[in-house]
Design a protein with these regions (language model features):
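A catalytic-pocket lid/entrance helix-loop region that shapes and gates access to the active site
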Residues: 196-259
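Catalytic histidine-centered segment of alpha/beta-hydrolase-like enzymes
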Residues: 424-435
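N-terminal cap/lid subdomain of alpha/beta-hydrolase-fold enzymes
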Residues: 73, 79-156, 366-386, 396-399, ...
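Alpha/beta-hydrolase fold active-site neighborhood
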Residues: 248-374
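Conserved acidic catalytic loop of the alpha/beta-hydrolase fold
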Residues: 157-172
């Protein structure tokens, strides 16, 4: 929820084509059976054990020292309310440590990476990790695509079925986790299936309870960082629109030379307005106060300004090609999740397209969208009143934290926690918390996973990750996405 890449639009993360609907095995999550004579549950090859589960399909295996890393698919109903109405193949990966270890269920809320990696909770508990691709992100998209089946309830059921299937092999404690939209996804999963997981760690997860009230974002941008940085960012954003005609001409030339088109948003000029509106949000989402020195002067050359805009917001994001990969996110933002808006008084007189900064404008018009009121409010009420053993981690300077999940009464008694990393951005994690909060968070994760050492159970200040840091496996760079997409 993160490999550095070309920035994509702010409202919002392939391997071949896999088998589609209709020809898949039965959907039942049946227990694993059939180990050969003399072969125990522990010595049986893990790939063979997984593939004995009905609906599992092997894609590839990649070597990684100390683990088995498998890429697989699992047959899921297109519609969990009507499982007879077709199936699709949902891609996931398995980082296998041991069936004697706890398992972390991770999702970014977008595509799944097929490069071995380990989330922070997985390192803390020294466990296995199942990473699932969110439905409708290719190749995990039903064919034909019935977009009405893309919602948080259907996605939670995807996780529930995969958990039920794999629990037959991985019988120890399970935790759910994810960052950004993945943190939202982990939270929604717990709301609909509160007893599947022993705990949930949600990183930088937005909570847009009232989509029509975005005043928290205005308050955030009025106070984030220091005044000098805020003022200069606003000045550069305004200058980007003052020089609009010159830069849009260059933008269109770049698009023509690189096969980029603007059919969905309507024109390069409309795309550029979105790119500029992303600028301040994207800066704080992915950068720190210490990066303010990189903001160019208002009188900088157009070349320098163009480069800064592309580096921070990214010109590719609002092209048809940039939007297509994230159509499922924009669809959800415009039907259930909500999306942020914010006032920009310093841009008065320079904006040409009122209302353009909205998810409906990033989804092809042949895909119908209808807002469902109350979906986020339901999750919010559940978190405040009924959730248990949940940890929310935010970054102080991350715009998405302006509307966080809030904990209700007796949160500590329910082992619910919310911590904020000082000065942190959209890549904030447990390791960046102040010492006492870091110890509490780490200790809780260990306890939920059932692997807290005696010393930690006695004094949480002794809590630390059980697995040593692996520079390759634990590298979690922030995925560069523009502001309207978490």
């Amino acid at each position: 929820m993160r490999t550095a890449r070309r920035w994509l639009p702010a409202l919002v993360m392939c391997i071949g084509t896999l088998a589609g609907a209709g020809a898949a095995p039965a959907l039942a999550a049946t227990a694993v059976t059939g180990t050969s004579a003399g072969e125990t549950q522990e010595t049986a090859d893990i790939k063979d054990r997984i593939l004995q589960i009905p609906g599992m399909h092997f894609v590839e295996e990649k070597p990684y020292q100390g683990y088995r890393y498998l890429v697989l698919t699992y047959t899921q109903p297109v519609d969990h309310r009507h499982p007879d109405r077709g199936t699709f193949e949902q891609r996931f990966t398995l980082l296998h440590k041991s069936t004697d270890r706890p398992t972390v269920f991770y999702t970014s809320g977008y595509n799944v990476s097929t490069t071995p990696s380990r989330s922070e909770p997985t390192r803390i508990v020294d466990g296995n990790q199942v990473s699932m691709e969110y439905r409708f992100f290719t190749p995990s998209r039903p064919q034909p695509a019935d977009w009405s089946t893309l919602d948080i309830w259907q996605a939670a059921n995807d996780q529930h079925r995969l958990y039920q299937a794999l629990k037959t092999v991985y019988g120890k404690n399970w935790l759910a986790t994810g960052g950004s939209k993945g943190g939202m996804t982990a939270t929604y999963y717990r709301r609909f299936f509160p007893h599947d997981m022993n705990g949930t760690v949600a990183y930088v997860a937005p909570n847009d309870v009232h989509n029509g009230d975005d005043r928290p974002y205005d308050r955030f941008f009025a106070t984030v960082g220091d005044k000098a940085c805020r003022t200069q960012l606003d000045s550069v954003q305004r200058e980007a629109l003052v020089r609009r005609d010159e830069i849009v001409a260059r933008y269109q030339k770049w698009a023509d030379e690189n096969g980029k088109t603007f059919k969905v948003v309507g024109s390069a000029d409309k795309a550029y307005e979105n790119v500029v509106l992303d600028l301040v949000w994207s800066f704080w989402q992915y950068h720190l106060q210490s990066d303010c020195a990189s903001v160019p002067a208002t009188k900088a050359s157009t070349d320098e300004l163009y480069k800064f805009i592309d580096t921070i917001s990214g010109f590719d994001g609002y092209t048809d090609q940039g939007l297509e990969r994230f159509t499922p996110y924009y669809y959800q933002a415009g039907t259930e999740l909500g999306s942020p808006t914010f006032k920009s008084p310093h841009l008065k007189g320079l904006l040409r397209y009122p209302g353009i900064y909205a998810p409906r404008n990033y989804v092809s018009r042949d895909i119908p969208m209808k807002w469902k009121p109350g979906v986020m409010a339901d999750v919010d009420r559940w978190v405040r009143n009924d959730s248990t053993q949940m940890l929310f981690v935010y970054g102080q300077n991350d715009p998405w934290g302006a509307e966080p999940f809030r904990l209700g009464r007796n949160a500590a008694a329910r082992h619910d926690f919310r911590f904020v990393a000082p000065g942190g951005n959209h890549g904030s994690n447990i390791a960046q918390l102040v010492a006492d909060e870091r110890a509490t968070a780490t200790a809780e994760v260990l306890k939920w996973a059932g692997v807290a050492p005696a010393a930690v159970q006695k004094d949480e200040r002794h809590a630390k990750p059980l697995a040593p840091y692996d520079a390759k496996l634990d590298r979690q760079p922030v995925e560069r996405e523009a502001s309207l997409r978490p």
